[in-house]
Design a protein with these regions (language model features):
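Substrate-binding cleft and catalytic face of glycoside hydrolase catalytic domains
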Residues: 19-183, 189-191
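Charged helix-capping and loop-helix junction motifs
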Residues: 13, 44-49, 198-201
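Surface-exposed beta-strand edges and their flanking turn/coil or helix-capping segments
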Residues: 3-6, 78, 199
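Substrate-binding cleft/loops of secretory-pathway carbohydrate-active enzymes
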Residues: 185-213
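Secreted glycan hydrolases and related glycan-binding modules that recognize and/or cleave
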Residues: 1, 98, 103-104, 204-206
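Short, well-ordered alpha-helical scaffold segments within catalytic/effector domains
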Residues: 14, 98, 165, 197-198
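Boundary/entry segment of secreted carbohydrate-active catalytic domains
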Residues: 1-20
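Conserved acidic functional residues
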Residues: 1, 66, 213
């Protein structure tokens, strides 16, 4: 929209994007939120999240909030720690995570939004809140074999399973403190990979974390 793009249905009638999705049969939306996306245009800030959620609520669509716990994209190849949390201890970072989660969710609650689902982390097969060497655009730098260099492994599921589970448990409790009825989710990619799910959910379970879905 900010670039002037417009959306049309099959009859050539102009529609707002979320309204068009509703018209096409969608009944739920999933919106990400980053910690400080100011270096990336400000998209997916809590303010941007609210605007999108308000559009969905007005159309009676269910809402999922996707916490990346990063300033930009988080995925299996990179889960870069937010710049403002860099250098913090494990205990400090749990406080950062809880404060960010509660701040965003209270902002939604104060504006009449209640998510049906909340993701604690995005594509967390390797955990979250760990960093890799990245270029100036935030993309991971890979060697000739396609491997990345981990520069901070605090929340890495394989390197530090207890801390990964501790971060997830902190996020779960923070979500429930604001929205006790929301469904708090583990979000993993590759739904066909049973070994991945057994490993990751096993790490969480064996280290005291819990989830709803």
């Amino acid at each position: 929209e900010s670039k002037g793009y417009k959306f049309y249905n099959k009859n050539g009638q102009e529609r707002e994007c979320t309204a068009l999705m509703k018209e096409l049969g969608l009944n739920a939306v999933r919106h990400r939120v980053w910690v400080d996306p100011s270096a990336h245009g400000g998209w997916c800030s809590k303010e941007d999240l609210l605007v999108k959620c308000q559009r969905a609520k007005a159309l009676d669509m269910a809402i999922m909030v996707d916490f990346h716990y990063s300033d930009w994209w988080a995925d299996p190849q990179k889960q870069n720690i937010p710049a403002s949390w860099s250098g913090h201890s494990y205990e400090q970072m749990k406080e950062d995570l809880a404060a960010h989660t509660i701040d965003v969710l209270m902002y939604l609650k104060d504006n009449g939004i209640e998510p049906k689902w909340i993701q604690v982390g995005n594509e967390t097969r390797n955990g979250f809140l760990w960093s890799v060497k990245s270029n100036e655009h935030g993309w991971p730098v890979m060697d000739e074999n396609g491997n990345t260099t981990i520069t901070e492994s605090m929340g890495h599921a394989m390197n530090n399973p207890e801390q990964y589970a501790g971060f997830f448990a902190t996020g779960y409790d923070a979500c429930k403190s604001v929205f006790p009825n929301s469904i708090v989710m583990v979000h993993l990619d590759n739904g066909f990979d049973k070994d991945l799910y057994d490993f990751n959910l096993g790490v969480l379970r064996d280290n005291g974390a819990k989830w709803d879905m």
